[in-house]
């Protein structure tokens, strides 16, 4: 779904040299020999006839031709030997001089692959450990990180590039936005000024919200004037803090040509509702740590009766958790069932304890009519929220809303607040050491000036040539999906036609949005003040301007070419309500993609990610949307029932995987597992198409593996990763992706071409007889 704006090989081909022999009926004059051939002392045609009888001239000519042919064969053999066996073989053969880009890239690729492998492990028993065992042995998780993997290493490279760009002087070419992002970055680094201010910036925000306990006893000053709607406006419309529910502007799922206001369940601080329910020892520990965190922040902000306040706010959040529905519940995954478009007048009747027209008028600076339509995505939840408002003391409601604002902004305060946040994160996820300040500030620059920073990034680190090559790779993989659709035996003709139409209409965005090349267009995204000495105020200015941009969209025409993430993002995504795939420049970097790598590695690396995102258009979530991005059931009942049966096979497969005594939830991870499996197949068959069109690739120097095997190794090495044990608990609980080990094993074991490439015996762990397959 689209979020509100305010809130992420080529070779030197063998050149055949055609040498022309002029030996013929006219004699041997002018014979041309390739360079390096020794030239004989042959006699001229005018020599003594007695030394060269007439009948032997043909023999001499024939002999010369044979000598020439033998010499030519010797040269060709030498060239091929250099190409295939010499140190430059991986780089395109003997024609590639020492130090040429292809040779260096191939050598780098070979070193990377071989260092990550553990050849002592049978790939047919545990392909992940075979492909990643060497990497796992050699790497530890940095103290300030929860995880570390091969993709994270690309992120480190991108971060270093961004830091260097931000460290440059503010002057020079570029628009105001580039100067602002550098000033913002410096303001974030200025901890001396941040420490000097201490809690003061947050205390001013709390005062703006009415202070603590304003909704208390009637004899308190201001108690009679307390208005929940005004405080909700402050929280949601000024500070962008979701409280009780969320208000966003997004594409209308049933009419993606227009924007609509969406109201949904929200307002919890912890990342998953079940953490509030303390159903196991780990969630009990996290809940206890959260209570300590609340008390610590409340004390830092001068609140009284800290334990009581913390307990009351926590109990209110627990009530919200009890009436919320998990994001992985069938009720949430079925978008059509959740979608409920109502008028403002109807909304007021459904949820009567809020003044909806007044609230939306204030946030959107509009005068909405009672007939204005909004989309309610959690009708039952919102009805229960209305009852919760009625039954909860005003003082507790007020403190909860103020707390939600505090949680959103406290990371931008002085060291005591940051230390409290780190202690909570340490208990939840296990990171021992806080992130270094420069990384924190780079993250904030990405969040608040993503496109401005992206303009700097793509100018120096992503070429138009790379963009064109990746676009061609995407088209090859799309072509394969079109073929696969035709070959499916479980999908009828009517559904195939709709699936092909969706593929044809799918938009593909690669690298960066074109407006980044125009400084004045980038400047319009950041028309707010930034000063080097006012970091907290810079944050507030950014939040308020982002809200303005978001609310203005409600009356604007939809631009389906807009991007959700900036180009430096180390990510890729598919948006079903736009039918749009996006591959930012940040992920199109070595080792996922390198134009000089063998194509087996590019298709196994970035190609499987492209196939993954493409398959999302046809998984259990994306498959609910049609070619225009509208929520519309385009399947026949017969085809859809076949799809569900095939999907259930994948659910059962992943339900059998466990990590740290936690069972992977096959239903939670279904969409990502379908995409992993489908993406692997599409990329593999696209690579086979490339080989048919360009010819087999040359062996990678000093590696004994075929390029089909290297394709699968590259895929697996995308997901070489280490996680802290505490973070695995949250991953299994909240992540829609299966743990990386099982992303690899689940995908390759269900693909017959993998077993064929590695000669895996039938019914070995990586080549079971019965396989799950959708696409």
Swiss-Prot record:
One of its GO terms (molecular function) is metal ion binding. It comes from the Eukaryota. Its cofactor is Zn(2+). The chain crosses the membrane at residues 62-82. Disulfide bonds join 124-760, 132-720, 188-441, 649-772. Its main location: membrane. Its EC number is 3.4.24.-. It is a single-pass type II membrane protein. Pfam families: Peptidase_M13 (PF01431), Peptidase_M13_N (PF05649). GO terms for cellular component: plasma membrane. Residues 30-52 are annotated as: Disordered. Residues 99-775 form the Peptidase M13 domain. GO terms for biological process: proteolysis; respiratory system process. The active site is at 613, 676 (proton donor). It is found in: Membrane. Residues 83-775 are lumenal. Zn(2+) binds at residues 612, 616, 672. PROSITE patterns: NEPRILYSIN (PS51885), ZINC_PROTEASE (PS00142). May contribute to the degradation of peptide hormones and be involved in the inactivation of neuronal peptides. This is Endothelin-converting enzyme-like 1. It comes from Mus musculus (Mouse).
């Amino acid at each position: 779904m689209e979020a509100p704006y305010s809130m992420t090989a080529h070779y030197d081909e063998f050149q055949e040299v055609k040498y022309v022999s002029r030996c013929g009926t006219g004699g041997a004059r002018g014979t041309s020999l390739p360079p390096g051939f020794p030239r004989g002392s042959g006699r001229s045609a005018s020599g003594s006839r007695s030394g060269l009888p007439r009948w032997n001239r043909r023999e001499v000519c024939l002999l010369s031709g044979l000598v020439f042919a033998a010499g030519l064969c010797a040269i060709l053999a030498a060239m091929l030997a250099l190409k295939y066996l010499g140190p430059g073989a991986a780089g395109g053969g003997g024609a590639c001089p020492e130090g040429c880009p292809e040779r260096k890239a191939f050598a780098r690729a070979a070193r990377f692959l071989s260092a990550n492998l553990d050849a002592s492990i049978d790939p047919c028993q545990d392909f992940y450990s075979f492909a990643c065992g060497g990497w796992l042995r050699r790497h530890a998780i940095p103290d300030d990180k929860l995880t570390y993997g091969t993709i994270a290493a690309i992120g480190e490279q991108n971060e270093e590039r961004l830091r260097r760009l931000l460290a440059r002087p503010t002057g020079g070419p570029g628009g105001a936005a580039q100067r602002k992002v550098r000033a913002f970055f410096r303001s974030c680094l200025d901890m001396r000024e941040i420490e000097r201010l201490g809690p003061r910036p947050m205390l001013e925000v709390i005062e703006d919200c009415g202070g603590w306990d304003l909704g208390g006893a009637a004899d308190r000053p201001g108690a009679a004037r307390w208005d929940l709607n005004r405080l909700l406006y402050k929280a949601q419309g000024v500070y962008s803090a979701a409280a009780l529910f969320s208000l966003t502007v997004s594409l209308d799922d049933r009419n993606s040509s227009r924007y609509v206001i969406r109201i949904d369940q929200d307002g919890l601080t912890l990342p998953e509702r079940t953490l509030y329910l303390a159903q196991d020892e780990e969630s009990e520990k996290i809940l206890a740590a959260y209570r300590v965190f609340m008390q610590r922040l409340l004390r830092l902000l001068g609140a009284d009766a800290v334990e009581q306040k913390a307990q009351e706010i926590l109990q209110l959040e627990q009530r919200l958790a009890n009436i919320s529905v998990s994001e992985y519940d069938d009720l949430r995954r079925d978008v059509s069932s959740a979608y409920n478009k109502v008028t403002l007048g109807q909304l007021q009747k459904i949820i009567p304890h809020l003044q909806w027209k007044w609230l939306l008028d204030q946030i959107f600076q509009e005068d909405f009519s009672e007939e204005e339509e909004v989309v309610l995505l959690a009708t039952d939840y919102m009805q229960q929220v209305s009852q919760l408002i009625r039954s909860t003391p005003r003082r507790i409601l007020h403190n909860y809303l103020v707390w939600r604002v505090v949680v959103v902004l406290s990371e931008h305060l002085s060291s005591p607040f940051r230390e409290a946040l780190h202690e909570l994160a340490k208990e939840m996820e296990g990171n021992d050491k806080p992130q270094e300040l420069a990384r924190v500030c780079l993250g904030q620059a990405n969040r608040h000036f993503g496109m401005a920073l992206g303009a700097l990034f793509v100018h120096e680190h992503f070429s138009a040539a790379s963009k064109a090559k990746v676009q061609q790779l995407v088209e090859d993989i799309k072509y394969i999906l079109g073929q696969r659709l035709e070959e499916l035996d479980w999908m009828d003709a009517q559904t195939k036609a709709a699936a092909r139409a969706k593929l044809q209409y799918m938009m593909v965005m690669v690298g960066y949005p074109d407006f980044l090349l125009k400084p004045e267009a980038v400047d319009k995204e950041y028309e707010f003040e930034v000063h080097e000495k006012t970091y907290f105020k810079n944050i507030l200015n950014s939040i308020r301007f982002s809200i303005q941009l978001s609310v203005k969209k409600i009356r604007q025409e939809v631009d389906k070419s807009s991007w959700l993430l900036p180009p430096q993002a180390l990510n890729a995504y598919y948006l079903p309500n736009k039918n749009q795939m996006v591959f930012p420049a940040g992920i199109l970097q070595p080792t996922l993609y390198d134009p000089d790598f063998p194509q087996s590695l590019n298709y196994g690396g970035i190609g499987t990610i492209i196939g993954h995102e493409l398959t999302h258009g046809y998984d259990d979530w994306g498959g609910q949307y049609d070619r225009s991005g509208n929520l519309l059931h385009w399947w026949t009942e017969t085809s859809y029932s076949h799809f569900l049966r095939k999907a259930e096979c994948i659910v059962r497969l992943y339900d059998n995987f466990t990590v740290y005594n936690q069972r992977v939830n096959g239903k939670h991870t279904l969409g990502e597992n379908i995409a992993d499996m489908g993406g692997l197949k599409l990329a593999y068959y696209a690579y086979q198409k490339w080989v048919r069109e360009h010819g087999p690739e040359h062996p990678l120097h000093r590696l004994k593996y075929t390029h089909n095997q290297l394709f699968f190794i590259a895929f697996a090495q995308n997901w070489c990763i280490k996680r802290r044990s505490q973070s695995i608990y949250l991953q299994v609980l909240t992540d829609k992706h299966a743990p990386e080990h099982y992303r690899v094993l689940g995908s390759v074991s269900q693909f017959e071409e993998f077993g064929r490439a590695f000669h895996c015996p039938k019914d070995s762990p990586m080549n079971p007889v019965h396989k799950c397959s959708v696409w």
